[in-house]
């Protein structure tokens, strides 16, 4: 489920993710092994859209350009390695995670849940929206393509095997995993899920960016709306 509005998190500006994890009693064991990138490409299984974004990642209009992708995490239960998957949607206006879903399997349902939330959040955009992704199987599905068309949304896809066409998502996943995942072993799905949820809230509300005039994504959006 989406916890953007439901997770209780400290309001102290200097409190980082590690301290929040400690406060919530989340225990992890360190290790240093960088996981292989998850690849959702299964060939041409549906409709492959043209790359309409062309790496034009900047926009001065909230909710106009949205990008998405899927990434994989590993955790352990009773000594057995298992996996979970994160499907976030990011607004290129302010790099805010506007919706996401975490699941135990790489399913279209998980992509669709996050998509529906993103459609609702961005429905106030006065211009035609563009939703960008890679050529993963879920984004080629008939239901996904039809849903974007029904909302008059341009669908855009990266060129095959070109991660730079969706570098915003690549950088986001890299940052997330560097700060809360690499160097840790999680003992349950719930533990890993909670840490991801906490970090996304921290990222949206606390993590300042130079390109956002040293504001967090949500601060930048609110400042824009109030001016």
Pin down the residues of each PLM region:
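Basic, flexible linker segments flanking DNA-binding modules
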Residues: 1-61, 162, 216-224
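Short small-residue beta-strand/loop micro-motif enriched in glycine and branched aliphatics
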Residues: 94-100, 155-158, 182-183
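RNase H-like two-metal-ion nuclease catalytic core shared by retroviral integrases
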Residues: 39-40, 44, 133-135, 141-142, ...
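Retroviral integrase
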Residues: 64, 96, 108, 116-119, ...
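Active-site beta-loop-alpha junctions of metal-dependent nucleic acid enzymes
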Residues: 82, 101-124
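An active-site-proximal beta-strand-loop segment
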Residues: 55-98
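C-terminal domain-tail junction helix/linker
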Residues: 149-153, 175-227
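Mobile genetic element proteins and their domesticated derivatives, centered on retroelements
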Residues: 1, 17, 21, 53, ...
């Amino acid at each position: 489920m989406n916890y953007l509005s439901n997770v209780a998190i400290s309001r102290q500006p200097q409190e980082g993710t590690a301290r929040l994890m400690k406060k919530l009693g989340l225990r992890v064991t360190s290790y240093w092994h960088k996981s292989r990138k998850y690849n959702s490409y299964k060939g041409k299984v549906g409709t492959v859209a043209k790359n309409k974004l062309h790496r034009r990642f900047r926009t001065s209009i909230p909710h106009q350009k949205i990008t998405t992708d899927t990434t994989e995490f590993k955790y352990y239960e009773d000594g057995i390695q298992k996996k979970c998957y994160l499907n976030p949607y990011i607004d290129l206006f302010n790099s805010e995670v506007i919706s996401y879903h975490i699941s135990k399997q790489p399913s279209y349902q998980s992509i669709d849940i996050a998509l529906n939330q993103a459609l609702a959040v961005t429905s106030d955009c006065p211009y035609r929206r563009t939703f960008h992704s890679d050529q993963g199987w879920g984004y080629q599905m008939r239901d996904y393509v039809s849903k974007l068309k029904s909302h008059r949304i341009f669908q855009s896809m990266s060129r095959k095997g070109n991660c730079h066409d969706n570098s915003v998502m690549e950088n986001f996943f890299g940052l997330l995993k560097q700060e809360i995942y690499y160097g840790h072993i999680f003992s349950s799905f719930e533990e890993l899920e909670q840490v991801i949820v906490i970090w996304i809230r921290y990222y949206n509300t606390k993590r300042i960016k130079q390109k956002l005039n040293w504001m967090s994504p949500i601060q930048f959006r609110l400042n824009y709306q109030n001016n």
